[in-house]
Amino acid sequence: MNVAINGFGRIGRLVLRASAKNPLINIVAINDPFVSTTYMEYMLEYDTVHGKFDGSLSHDETHIFVNGKPIRVFNEMNPENIKWGEEQVQYVVESTGAFTTLEKASTHLKNGVEKVVISAPSSDAPMFVMGVNHELYEKNMHVVSNASCTTNCLAPLAKVVNDKFGIKEGLMTTVHAVTATQKTVDGPSKKDWRGGRGACFNIIPSSTGAAKAVGKVIPSLNGKLTGMSFRVPTADVSVVDLTARLVNPASYDEIKAAIKSASENEMKGILGYTEKAVVSSDFIGDSHSSIFDAEAGIALTDDFVKLVSWYDNEWGYSSRVLDLIEHMVKNE
C-alpha cells in the first residue's frame, strides 16, 4: 500500500520510523513546506526521545532514501497542490494538525488519493480507535480520524471495564508529557494563558476532549465521561487516571483479572498489563495504546475505583495510525 505523509512533525516522523519495520506499508512521499531534504534526513536520523534511526539514510534534492528506498519530498503549503499522483499515493496520513475536518482533509482526494487518515481528533470525520470500534469502518469512508493519543489510551480501558462491569460515570485526568504546541519559556498564548507558561518549569492544568471523545467511539458511554489534563515537564510517555463509578460492584482483583484477560486475548497488542514497579520512562517505545498499571490503581468501595494506564503518546499512537491503515486496506 502506497502511503504519503503530510506534515513531518513528531507524529509524521514516527509514523515513518514505524513503517520502516512494517512490510505492508510503503511510504512513497512526504510533504512539508518548511523542511528541506537535507534537514529531513537529519530530523529522521536523530531523536532526543527515541534515539538514532536504526537504518541507512541519505538524500538528494527531491528525495530522502530510507534503507535505500526513495521517498519523494514535496514542499507545498496547500494540499491541493501536492502532486501525490506522481508517486501513485493511495493513502495520506494527514499529520500537520491543520487539516482536521472532512472538508479540509478531503483536499488530498483531488490528487488521486483514495483515503486520508487524520492523526488527530476531528469534529466531523468518522473517528476510530483500534481495538474499540475499528470494525465499524466502512469502505465508503474516504476520510477518517485516528482520534487522539489520550483517547487511544482511555478507550480500550474504558471498553473492557464497561463491557464487564458497566461504567455509571467517570472522570479522567491525563498527566501528559510536553508537546510541540507548548512554550519552552513563558510566551504569549491568547486563548490559553496557562498554556503560554514555560513547559520545562511547570505543571500546567489544561483542557482535553479525550474523555468526551470516548463517547463517540463507545456510544453507551456518551455523556458519562469527561476529563482534564496536567502538562508536565517530561519529554514523552503520559498516564491516564480514570476514576469511575461502576454499575455492577466488583472487587479490584476482579477488575484486574478482566483487564489482564483482555490484554492477552481480544485486545492483545492494543491493551497491555503490568504488575511491576514501573515509572514513565519504562514505556518509551512501547507500541501499546494503553498499558494498565495494576499496582497503581486503588478502590474505595466495590463500585468506586481509580484505574491507571500508561501510554507512549508518540510511538504507541503512531503505531495505531499504521494499524488503522492496514485495517482499512483489508476491508476494501
UniProtKB/Swiss-Prot annotation:
SUPFAM superfamilies: Glyceraldehyde-3-phosphate dehydrogenase-like, C-terminal domain, NAD(P)-binding Rossmann-fold domains
Binding site for D-glyceraldehyde 3-phosphate: S148, C149, T150, T179, T208, G209, R231
Keywords: Cytoplasm, Glycolysis, NAD, Oxidoreductase
Binding site for NAD(+): R10, I11, D32, M77, N313
A cellular component annotation (GO) from this entry: cytosol
Family membership noted in the UniProt record: Belongs to the glyceraldehyde-3-phosphate dehydrogenase family.
NCBIfam families attached to this UniProt entry: GAPDH-I
This protein's name: Glyceraldehyde-3-phosphate dehydrogenase
